[in-house]
């Protein structure tokens, strides 16, 4: 599946509560990006993603996959948390290298399952060699995501992976 696992649809739509009309716009953006689904990862707000998922499932017959999540701070790092089926939680460090003072290596522990390798908002601040080395050392999944703050940016970067593979990594 083509999945963009780091998006901010509330900011992208300027709506803090999703409606059927707003979700229709999100679905159109996901499809325009050639994706099968997205992770909705608002800053400190997991409820938005769950509400979008509920509307997609109820009103749009599950037309796209929606993985609810949130982006939180862990020290100076930004951690993206995805809430997968069967209460499985997958966590990855978003845009390592931003903020610049973040100590990536010290933020990697057993709760982290992946590292974002590509992110169009922060590629200039990310050290690909270091990210790849740390991913290999810690057996972490490398991900590419848009970090979209506008609907038109959804799918600019994405990861090809099955949800089952994310679940297996997180167990």
Describe each model-derived feature in a short phrase.
Residues 5, 41, 70, 94, ...:
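Active-site flanking residues adjacent to catalytic metal/cofactor-binding acidic residues
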Residues 1-5, 9-19, 24, 28, ...:
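Charged catalytic cores and adjacent phosphate/nucleic-acid-binding surfaces used
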Residues 87-95:
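N-terminal-biased segments
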Residues 26-45:
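Divalent metal-dependent hydrolysis catalytic cores, especially in the metallo-beta-lactamase
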Residues 66-72:
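Hydrophobic/aromatic-rich structural module bridging two neighboring secondary-structure elements via a short loop
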């Amino acid at each position: 599946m083509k999945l963009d696992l780091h998006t901010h649809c509330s900011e992208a739509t300027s709506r803090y509560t999703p409606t059927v009309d707003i979700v229709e716009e999100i679905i159109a953006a996901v499809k325009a990006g050639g994706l099968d689904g997205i992770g909705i990862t608002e800053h400190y707000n997991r409820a938005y993603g769950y509400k979008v998922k509920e509307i997609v499932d109820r009103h749009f017959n599950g037309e796209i996959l929606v993985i609810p999540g949130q982006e939180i701070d862990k020290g100076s790092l930004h951690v993206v948390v995805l809430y997968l089926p069967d209460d499985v939680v997958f966590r990855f460090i978003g845009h390592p290298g931003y903020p610049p003072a973040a100590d990536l290596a010290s933020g990697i522990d057993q709760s982290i399952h992946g590292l974002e390798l590509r992110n169009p908002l922060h590629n200039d601040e990310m050290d690909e060699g270091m990210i790849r080395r740390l991913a290999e050392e810690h057996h972490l999944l490398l991900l590419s995501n848009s970090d979209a703050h506008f609907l038109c940016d959804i799918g600019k970067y994405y990861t090809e992976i099955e949800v089952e593979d994310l679940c297996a990594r997180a167990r």
